């Protein structure tokens, strides 16, 4: 399963972002998915 926009994700091991999203840790310590666009 993948997670969508503003959902918590992890760069190293799941959950991973759905297609069209990337994981950012700008909001450390919580990493969230953001739209690629």
From Swiss-Prot:
Keyword RNA-binding set for record: no
InterPro entries, per database record: Beta/delta-agatoxin_fam
Cysteines engaged in disulfide bonds, as pairs: 2-18, 9-23, 17-33, 25-31
Subcellular location: Secreted
Aminoacyl-tRNA synthetase recorded as keyword: no
Domain notes: The presence of a 'disulfide through disulfide knot' structurally defines this protein as a knottin.
Protein name: Mu-agatoxin-Aa1d
